[in-house]
Amino acid sequence: MTARLLTPSKITAWLSCEHALTLQHQLESGAIAPVAQPFGSFARLLANKGLEHEAACLAAYRAQGLSVLEIPDRKRSETFAEWVERVGDPFAEGHDVIYQLPFAHDGVRGVADFVLRVVDEETGQVSYEPVDAKLARSEAKPGHVLQLCFYAEAIEALTGTLPAQMHLWLGSGEFETIRTNDVMPYWRHLRSGSNSLMSEAETTPIPCDHCEICDFASVCEDRWRAEDAVHLVAGVRTVDLAPLEAAGIETVEALAEVSPGSELEGVDPDRLLRMASQAELQRAARTGPGEAPPPFRLIEPPDGLPGSLGYEQLPEPDDGDVFLDFEGHPFWRPSGGLFFLFGWLCRDDAGDGAGGAWTYHARWAHDLDEEGEQVGELIEYLAERRRRRPGMHVYHYNHTERSTLERLARQHGVGELLLDELVGTGAFVDLLAVIRDGMQVGVESYGLKHLEVLAGYQRGEDIGQGAGAVVAYEEFMANGDQDSLDRIADYNADDVRATRALRDWLVEQRDDAHHWRDAELDPDEQPEELEARVAALKAFGPGTDEHLLADLLGYWQREWSAHKVQRMSRLMGLLGS
């Protein structure tokens, strides 16, 4: 049998999902065949962005006038151990920076992005500290720190001195430093249990965050479907699996058979009933006609309420309504992302908001300045449209568009008070919240693309969902191909049209017992004057007292808005539990 190799990345994977490491070992031993990579172009995009970040870090070291040793690449014909032997001891040469240094130490192997030569100013003692370049922007992740711990341990074995510090060069450009002794005990604890990492003990796949980036996602997905795993029921959470399994409920079929009034230790009775109802709907969807939309049922309102909690969030349709969707590139630059398309659907009109045809609008932003301009113009457009038609609303699916617009308005310092007024007076309507609190549907996911079939919506453009839009935009950045932008716009137009179709379908299902949500709440304050004051102060330019004062104006309104959003999110979580 081929000897199993341990790497820092394997230990990181093991922390996230034991089964992922089991499958990796099975792949290396030939027990399972290579798996088609599920993320394809997007995974390559991320890898390329990582290499770009490394190259930028390397260039920065050179720009500082430091002597840099680039380790020759590993030859195809040599093993990792032979590569390490060929590299020898690069520390003896006294370079300030060593790039891509391979280590093999105590059964673990890995390659450090950078190793820095450090001289103690008081004693003159020389030591070496590892630096890893990561696309993460805000702080180190546990796996990143563990990799650095291995490099530090390997450096100590070669030089006799444990690095006092380890470093991460984040995608944001920040240089995060970690005291080695603060984290090394945990690394050594993990290493002491490495036998369990290398064992052939049976593991079971459990859904976790690692699934989103795992090379073996399709392997586990096939197994779960073959087993009819209970977590395929929409709304079943990881914390529900243990009590369900303890009660012998391990499949969708078994959960669907749970009768009303049943009790299960560790699960709220109302929640158990809701999960069982969801499983029953999904089972019915499997046995129904292939082209038929999935079955659904309205959720009965709690005692004392006249109508569904979901439908109570739905306002009466208006000719001024707008349907909104954004597309963004999270890794546009290592230092930050970019929202490059702001798309919406509305009725064009001559001023009164009535009678026009539904038209799709696409506004592009190819740099941060343009992003700020589009955000400001969009907020002004929505505010002006709502002034003319107070009954209009901005519909979106999931909270992303509203929360993104709030974040971008703060980031660019544009339209914050106007947006606060729109949010505070209920202009934004999240259709996912309406559906989640108002009905159950026989689908595994409540994403837009799974629910638009209820309205009979048929898509025209499919570019692999959101990640596909990112890849297509990357193609545009590489070659300026207009066709890439056209495909993204067609995809985005599908999203807003599907959102409108779903809204119209919800209105058709509405019972007269449900009340329309109030169209508008009268704000206590008019933001126009304050907005003008802010603009006048901003004109003094960054760094001035006036510019700082502009940022402070409206502070309490923004804080109150954020407080309300947090409270509503918690309330929705309780209602959905």
Regions found by a protein language model. Name each.
Residues 309-314, 319, 323-335, 340-341, ...:
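RNase H-like, metal-dependent nuclease domains and their acidic two-metal-ion catalytic environment used
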Residues 316-377, 420:
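Metal-dependent catalytic core segments for phosphate chemistry
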Residues 1-123:
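Metal-dependent nuclease catalytic cores that hydrolyze phosphodiester bonds in DNA/RNA
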Residues 247-333, 384, 542, 555-577:
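Long, highly charged low-complexity segments
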Residues 10, 182-209, 213-289, 316-318:
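Cys/His-rich finger/ribbon microdomains and the adjacent scaffold used
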Residues 165-227, 238, 247, 443, ...:
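Acidic, Mg2+-coordinating catalytic module of metal-dependent nucleases/exonucleases
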